[in-house]
């Protein structure tokens, strides 16, 4: 116990001190750990925010990369499509050229005959092309092996030829025709099926493809269509004023032979072939010709019991008929009468009206710079004589220089009836005015009041005042003084140069004045004062129109016949007009000429 017990407590204390030291070390370590943990806990929110920011940045970058990837993918797709398109274009450009041909006929074994490159070939047809629907003359496409791979349309370009006659068809072949080219050579051609359903007549213009020998289309000849105006005029005899005697003459000449052909045959009377209407300009020659066609159509339809009146009025524009090429004018004349014969063959009355007849059918040998009338006149004569066998065609010519028309045309048997359309006198002027001044027009209240508000009396008074103003031989109406070859002199008044066209123009002027007055003042209606002023304006406007350079020619056109006029002097005062002139050379003519 002595020495052993003495060492025991020391050892215990030493051990306890070591334990305490170890515990203190652990406590110190734990305290450091606690401090570290506390610092980490304090710093964790900031790190969390930093991580969240990094995460958001990563997500944004991922979205940007995804969008960029989509754009790159689209660009790659476009590049691939473009490569495919370019490859197709290269393949297409590398294909051999396709040829064209004209289908001629088909065979039972499925092959067809085509015309291509100046050769006639028998070729096969692609299954994509229906052989049965191919038409004669149709254009087809050929591949490199000369097989038909596609059906096309019909040719639309070529030479223009004139049909002479249709030939007898040959079984299994396209119809044929005889045509005349521009150099008058004749050629036999085939008709394409595009023409087989159209009525063709001699003289038609056709489109020819010269290499294949097919005609494809009927071409309207514009120059002929413009010259010939087919129409049923709506002008009635009741629309014409002041020409009752001339209308009666022309009705006797035209309507009687058409309506009573049996009586003409019984009396062995040949109906007239033609009528010449001559007289000063603007007096109704063309108007009468149109009324003839209209009246004739109504009468014939009434006799036949047909409901609708039908006739043809072939209005030939004289100067436009002329053509600078030799033979063209004669061809136009032949076509005109051919058209007339075709229409007359249907049992329909046909009026062939030549306006300004003196411009194309002058006396042969009277031409100054050409002798074109030497062939045109005989052509017309032969056509008129050819009309003899037709029952429904009559020729009407109009001219204000009948002295210049070739006498062979005017002789009996051609233009049998000659009717002069004279200038209207006072009575005729009243009749003409009544066609344009009607009771349906707006009339001024003051003028109505002067005639007891009677519209008929007001219009009648207007017409009477206007006629008196125009036809009075007063000082203000003096127009010209003419000197004849025998030395006599005569004063001509405006009434000596009136025409139906001039009377209509006066009424139109008055109506225009009434309209302007209505727009300016609000008070409307036609007044007699408007008509008086219109007369003055019409006279003044035409003061300088008479051609005093060649009085004799002027007199013929104006309708003044008899003693030869050698001198004309105008009597218009206040205009500073020159005195008259003797015969020199003709210049421009005006309305009066």
Swiss-Prot record:
Q: Does the keyword tRNA processing apply?
A: no
Q: Which domain of life is it from?
A: Bacteria
Which UniProt key words apply to this protein? ATP-binding, Chaperone, Coiled coil, Nucleotide-binding, Proteasome
Q: Which GO terms describe its molecular function?
A: ATP binding; ATP hydrolysis activity
Q: Which residues form a coiled coil?
A: 23-95
- GO BP field: modification-dependent protein catabolic process; proteasomal protein catabolic process
User: Pathway, per Swiss-Prot/TrEMBL?
Assistant: Protein degradation; proteasomal Pup-dependent pathway
Pfam families documented for this protein: AAA (PF00004), Prot_ATP_ID_OB_C (PF16450), Prot_ATP_ID_OB_N (PF17758)
The cross-references to Gene3D superfamilies, in alphabetical order and at most eight, read: 1.10.8.60, 1.20.5.170, Nucleic acid-binding proteins, P-loop containing nucleotide triphosphate hydrolases
Similarity section: Belongs to the AAA ATPase family.
- Full protein name: Proteasome-associated ATPase
State the organism named in the record: Geodermatophilus obscurus (strain ATCC 25078 / DSM 43160 / JCM 3152 / CCUG 61914 / KCC A-0152 / KCTC 9177 / NBRC 13315 / NRRL B-3577 / G-20)
């Amino acid at each position: 116990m002595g020495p052993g017990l003495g060492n025991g407590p020391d050892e215990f204390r030493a051990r306890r001190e070591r334990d305490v030291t170890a515990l203190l070390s652990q406590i110190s370590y734990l305290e450091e750990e606690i401090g570290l943990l506390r610092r980490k806990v304090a710093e964790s929110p900031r790190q969390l925010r930093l991580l969240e920011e990094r995460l958001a940045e990563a997500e944004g970058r991922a979205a940007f990369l995804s969008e960029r990837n989509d754009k790159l993918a689209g660009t790659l797709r476009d590049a691939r499509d473009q490569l495919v398109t370019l490859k197709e274009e290269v393949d297409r450009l590398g294909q051999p050229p396709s040829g064209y041909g004209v289908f001629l006929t088909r065979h039972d074994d499925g092959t067809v005959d085509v015309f291509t490159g100046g050769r006639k070939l028998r070729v096969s047809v692609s299954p994509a092309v229906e052989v049965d629907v191919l038409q004669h003359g149709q254009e087809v496409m050929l591949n490199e092996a000369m097989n038909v791979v596609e059906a096309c349309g019909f040719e639309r370009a070529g030479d223009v030829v004139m049909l002479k006659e249709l030939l007898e068809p040959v079984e299994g072949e396209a119809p044929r025709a005889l045509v005349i080219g521009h150099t008058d050579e004749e050629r036999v051609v085939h008709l394409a099926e595009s023409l087989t359903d159209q009525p063709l007549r001699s003289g038609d213009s056709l489109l020819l493809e010269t290499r294949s020998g097919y005609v494809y289309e009927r071409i309207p000849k514009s120059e002929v269509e413009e010259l010939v105006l087919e129409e049923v005029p709506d002008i009635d005899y009741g629309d014409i004023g002041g020409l009752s005697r001339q209308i009666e003459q022309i009705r006797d000449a035209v309507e009687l032979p058409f309506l009573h052909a049996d009586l003409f045959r019984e009396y062995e009377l040949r109906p007239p072939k033609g009528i010449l209407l001559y007289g000063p300009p603007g007096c109704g020659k063309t108007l009468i010709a149109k009324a003839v066609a209209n009246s004739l159509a109504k009468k014939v339809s009434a006799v036949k019991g047909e409901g609708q009146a039908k006739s043809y009025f072939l209005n030939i524009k004289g100067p436009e008929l002329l053509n600078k090429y030799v033979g063209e004018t004669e061809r136009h004349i032949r076509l005109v009468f051919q058209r007339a014969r075709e229409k007359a063959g249907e049992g329909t009355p046909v009026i062939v009206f030549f306006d300004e007849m003196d411009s194309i059918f002058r006396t042969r040998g009277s031409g100054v710079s050409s002798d074109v009338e030497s062939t045109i006149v005989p052509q017309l004569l032969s056509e008129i004589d050819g009309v003899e066998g037709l029952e429904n065609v009559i020729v009407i010519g109009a001219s204000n220089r009948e002295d210049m028309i070739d006498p062979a045309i005017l002789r009996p048997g051609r233009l049998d009836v000659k009717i002069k359309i004279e200038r209207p006198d006072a009575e005729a002027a009243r009749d003409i005015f009544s066609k344009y001044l009607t009771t349906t027009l707006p009339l001024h209240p003051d003028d109505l009041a002067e005639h007891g508000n009677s519209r008929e009396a007001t219009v009648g008074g207007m017409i009477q005042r206007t006629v008196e103003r125009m036809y009075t031989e007063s000082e203000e109406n003096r127009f010209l003084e003419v000197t004849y070859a025998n030395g006599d002199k005569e004063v001509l008044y405006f009434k000596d140069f009136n025409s139906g066209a001039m009377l209509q123009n006066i009424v139109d002027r008055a109506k225009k004045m009434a309209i302007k007055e209505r727009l300016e003042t609000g008070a409307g209606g036609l007044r007699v004062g408007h008509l008086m002023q219109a007369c003055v304006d019409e006279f003044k406007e035409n003061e300088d129109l008479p051609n005093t350079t060649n009085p004799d020619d002027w007199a013929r056109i104006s309708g003044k016949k008899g003693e030869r006029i050698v001198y004309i002097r105008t009597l218009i005062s206040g205009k500073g007009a020159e005195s008259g002139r003797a015969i020199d050379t003709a210049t421009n003519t005006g309305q009066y000429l």
